[in-house]
Swiss-Prot record:
It is found in: Cytoplasm. It comes from Methylococcus capsulatus (strain ATCC 33009 / NCIMB 11132 / Bath). One of its GO terms (biological process) is nucleotide metabolic process. It comes from the Bacteria. Belongs to the Maf family. YhdE subfamily. It catalyses: dTTP + H2O = dTMP + diphosphate + H(+); UTP + H2O = UMP + diphosphate + H(+). GO terms for molecular function: dTTP diphosphatase activity; UTP diphosphatase activity. This is dTTP/UTP pyrophosphatase. The active site is at 74 (proton acceptor). The record marks 16, 75, 157 as: Important for substrate specificity. Nucleoside triphosphate pyrophosphatase that hydrolyzes dTTP and UTP. May have a dual role in cell division arrest and in preventing the incorporation of modified nucleotides into cellular nucleic acids. GO terms for cellular component: cytoplasm.
Length: 202
Protein backbone atom coordinates (compact mmCIF):
# COMPACT_ATOMS: atom_id res chain seq x y z
CA UNK A 1 0.00 0.00 0.00
CA UNK A 2 1.29 3.45 -0.88
CA UNK A 3 1.11 6.01 1.91
CA UNK A 4 -0.56 8.48 -0.42
CA UNK A 5 -3.38 5.97 -1.00
CA UNK A 6 -4.06 5.52 2.70
CA UNK A 7 -6.66 7.61 4.47
CA UNK A 8 -5.68 7.47 8.13
CA UNK A 9 -7.87 8.95 10.83
CA UNK A 10 -6.91 9.51 14.45
CA UNK A 11 -10.06 9.14 16.54
CA UNK A 12 -8.87 11.53 19.23
CA UNK A 13 -8.53 15.26 19.73
CA UNK A 14 -5.74 14.80 22.29
CA UNK A 15 -2.84 17.14 21.45
CA UNK A 16 -0.43 14.54 22.82
CA UNK A 17 -1.68 11.76 20.56
CA UNK A 18 -1.73 14.09 17.58
CA UNK A 19 1.88 15.06 18.26
CA UNK A 20 3.01 11.46 18.71
CA UNK A 21 1.30 10.09 15.60
CA UNK A 22 2.72 13.04 13.68
CA UNK A 23 6.24 11.80 14.37
CA UNK A 24 5.74 9.10 11.74
CA UNK A 25 5.41 11.75 9.05
CA UNK A 26 2.19 10.22 7.72
CA UNK A 27 -0.75 12.36 6.63
CA UNK A 28 -3.76 11.85 8.86
CA UNK A 29 -6.97 13.54 9.88
CA UNK A 30 -8.32 14.07 13.39
CA UNK A 31 -11.82 13.06 14.39
CA UNK A 32 -13.33 13.73 17.80
CA UNK A 33 -15.30 10.83 19.26
CA UNK A 34 -17.19 10.33 22.49
CA UNK A 35 -17.68 6.98 24.20
CA UNK A 36 -18.64 5.93 27.71
CA UNK A 37 -15.52 5.69 29.85
CA UNK A 38 -16.78 3.99 32.99
CA UNK A 39 -15.31 0.69 34.23
CA UNK A 40 -17.80 -2.14 34.52
CA UNK A 41 -18.28 -3.93 37.82
CA UNK A 42 -15.35 -6.28 38.32
CA UNK A 43 -13.71 -5.29 35.04
CA UNK A 44 -9.91 -5.59 35.14
CA UNK A 45 -7.92 -2.49 34.23
CA UNK A 46 -6.36 -4.17 31.17
CA UNK A 47 -9.78 -5.26 29.89
CA UNK A 48 -11.16 -1.78 30.48
CA UNK A 49 -8.45 0.09 28.62
CA UNK A 50 -8.68 -2.34 25.68
CA UNK A 51 -12.47 -1.98 25.56
CA UNK A 52 -12.42 1.81 25.61
CA UNK A 53 -9.79 1.98 22.86
CA UNK A 54 -11.85 -0.47 20.81
CA UNK A 55 -15.04 1.53 21.38
CA UNK A 56 -13.28 4.72 20.28
CA UNK A 57 -12.02 3.20 17.03
CA UNK A 58 -15.43 1.63 16.34
CA UNK A 59 -17.13 4.96 16.91
CA UNK A 60 -14.61 6.68 14.67
CA UNK A 61 -15.07 4.08 11.95
CA UNK A 62 -18.84 4.63 12.01
CA UNK A 63 -18.24 8.33 11.28
CA UNK A 64 -15.40 7.95 8.76
CA UNK A 65 -15.32 7.10 5.04
CA UNK A 66 -15.62 3.35 4.47
CA UNK A 67 -12.10 3.04 3.03
CA UNK A 68 -10.41 4.85 5.95
CA UNK A 69 -8.18 3.28 8.59
CA UNK A 70 -9.13 4.50 12.05
CA UNK A 71 -6.68 4.59 14.96
CA UNK A 72 -7.65 5.18 18.58
CA UNK A 73 -6.08 4.77 21.99
CA UNK A 74 -6.87 4.89 25.67
CA UNK A 75 -4.46 5.41 28.56
CA UNK A 76 -5.08 4.79 32.23
CA UNK A 77 -3.03 5.07 35.42
CA UNK A 78 -3.49 2.06 37.70
CA UNK A 79 -2.45 1.65 41.34
CA UNK A 80 -3.32 -1.42 43.41
CA UNK A 81 -5.74 -2.50 40.68
CA UNK A 82 -7.65 0.80 40.85
CA UNK A 83 -8.01 2.91 37.72
CA UNK A 84 -7.13 6.57 38.20
CA UNK A 85 -9.02 8.69 35.71
CA UNK A 86 -8.84 12.42 35.21
CA UNK A 87 -9.14 14.53 38.37
CA UNK A 88 -12.52 16.08 39.10
CA UNK A 89 -10.96 19.02 40.91
CA UNK A 90 -8.15 20.14 43.20
CA UNK A 91 -9.06 17.81 46.07
CA UNK A 92 -9.33 14.81 43.78
CA UNK A 93 -5.96 15.61 42.18
CA UNK A 94 -4.39 16.04 45.62
CA UNK A 95 -5.77 12.66 46.68
CA UNK A 96 -4.49 10.89 43.55
CA UNK A 97 -1.02 12.39 43.62
CA UNK A 98 -0.78 11.77 47.34
CA UNK A 99 -1.49 8.09 46.76
CA UNK A 100 1.01 7.90 43.90
CA UNK A 101 3.69 9.61 46.00
CA UNK A 102 6.65 7.36 46.75
CA UNK A 103 5.08 4.36 45.03
CA UNK A 104 5.19 2.51 41.71
CA UNK A 105 2.10 2.49 39.52
CA UNK A 106 1.29 1.13 36.09
CA UNK A 107 0.28 3.06 33.00
CA UNK A 108 -1.73 1.02 30.50
CA UNK A 109 -2.06 2.30 26.94
CA UNK A 110 -4.21 0.32 24.52
CA UNK A 111 -4.15 1.06 20.79
CA UNK A 112 -6.92 0.00 18.42
CA UNK A 113 -6.77 0.09 14.61
CA UNK A 114 -9.66 -0.67 12.26
CA UNK A 115 -9.93 -0.85 8.49
CA UNK A 116 -12.92 -2.45 6.86
CA UNK A 117 -13.78 -5.65 8.71
CA UNK A 118 -10.31 -5.93 10.25
CA UNK A 119 -9.52 -4.94 13.82
CA UNK A 120 -6.09 -5.02 15.45
CA UNK A 121 -5.11 -4.12 19.01
CA UNK A 122 -1.96 -3.71 21.06
CA UNK A 123 -1.26 -2.93 24.70
CA UNK A 124 1.66 -1.12 26.33
CA UNK A 125 2.28 -1.58 30.05
CA UNK A 126 4.73 0.77 31.77
CA UNK A 127 5.78 1.04 35.40
CA UNK A 128 6.38 4.49 36.86
CA UNK A 129 7.85 5.15 40.30
CA UNK A 130 7.20 8.53 41.89
CA UNK A 131 9.51 10.10 44.42
CA UNK A 132 7.98 11.34 47.66
CA UNK A 133 5.85 14.41 46.96
CA UNK A 134 5.16 17.30 49.32
CA UNK A 135 1.71 18.87 49.63
CA UNK A 136 3.14 22.24 48.61
CA UNK A 137 4.48 20.69 45.41
CA UNK A 138 1.17 19.00 44.66
CA UNK A 139 -0.79 22.22 45.17
CA UNK A 140 1.66 24.20 43.04
CA UNK A 141 1.40 21.61 40.29
CA UNK A 142 -2.39 21.75 40.30
CA UNK A 143 -2.24 25.55 40.15
CA UNK A 144 -0.18 25.27 36.95
CA UNK A 145 -3.22 23.82 35.19
CA UNK A 146 -1.24 20.98 33.65
CA UNK A 147 -2.82 18.01 35.47
CA UNK A 148 -6.46 19.02 35.00
CA UNK A 149 -7.20 16.76 32.01
CA UNK A 150 -4.58 14.05 32.55
CA UNK A 151 -5.11 10.49 33.75
CA UNK A 152 -3.61 10.18 37.21
CA UNK A 153 -3.39 13.98 37.44
CA UNK A 154 0.05 14.28 35.88
CA UNK A 155 1.72 14.72 32.49
CA UNK A 156 5.07 12.97 32.15
CA UNK A 157 5.94 15.06 29.09
CA UNK A 158 5.56 18.26 31.09
CA UNK A 159 6.26 19.44 34.61
CA UNK A 160 4.97 16.12 35.90
CA UNK A 161 8.25 14.51 34.89
CA UNK A 162 9.75 16.14 37.97
CA UNK A 163 7.79 13.61 40.04
CA UNK A 164 9.20 10.57 38.23
CA UNK A 165 12.06 8.74 39.92
CA UNK A 166 12.05 5.77 37.54
CA UNK A 167 10.30 4.64 34.36
CA UNK A 168 10.24 1.10 33.04
CA UNK A 169 8.50 0.88 29.70
CA UNK A 170 7.33 3.34 27.08
CA UNK A 171 7.60 7.10 27.56
CA UNK A 172 5.26 7.66 24.60
CA UNK A 173 2.89 5.08 26.08
CA UNK A 174 2.69 7.06 29.30
CA UNK A 175 2.05 10.16 27.19
CA UNK A 176 -0.90 8.46 25.53
CA UNK A 177 0.17 6.68 22.31
CA UNK A 178 2.92 4.04 22.51
CA UNK A 179 4.90 4.42 19.30
CA UNK A 180 6.37 0.91 19.15
CA UNK A 181 2.98 -0.76 19.48
CA UNK A 182 1.40 1.73 17.07
CA UNK A 183 4.10 1.06 14.49
CA UNK A 184 3.47 -2.67 14.79
CA UNK A 185 -0.22 -2.13 14.10
CA UNK A 186 0.49 0.08 11.09
CA UNK A 187 2.34 -2.84 9.50
CA UNK A 188 -1.08 -4.36 8.87
CA UNK A 189 -1.69 -1.44 6.51
CA UNK A 190 1.53 -2.13 4.62
CA UNK A 191 3.47 0.56 6.47
CA UNK A 192 6.69 -1.05 7.67
CA UNK A 193 9.09 0.47 10.16
CA UNK A 194 11.49 1.61 7.41
CA UNK A 195 8.67 3.60 5.80
CA UNK A 196 7.75 5.19 9.12
CA UNK A 197 11.37 6.09 9.85
CA UNK A 198 11.76 7.63 6.42
CA UNK A 199 8.53 9.54 6.83
CA UNK A 200 9.66 11.00 10.13
CA UNK A 201 12.84 12.44 8.63
CA UNK A 202 12.93 16.22 8.05
Amino acid sequence: MQAEDLKLILASTSPRRRELLGRFGLPFEVLGVEVEEVPRCGEAAEDYVRRVASDKSARGQSMAPSDAAVLAADTEVVLDGQIFGKPQGAEHAREMLGRLSGRTHEVLSAVSLRRGDCHWQALSVSRVRFRDLGLEEIDAYWASGEPADKAGAYAIQGRGELFVAELQGSFSGVMGLPLLETARLLRHLGLGTARLLAGAAP
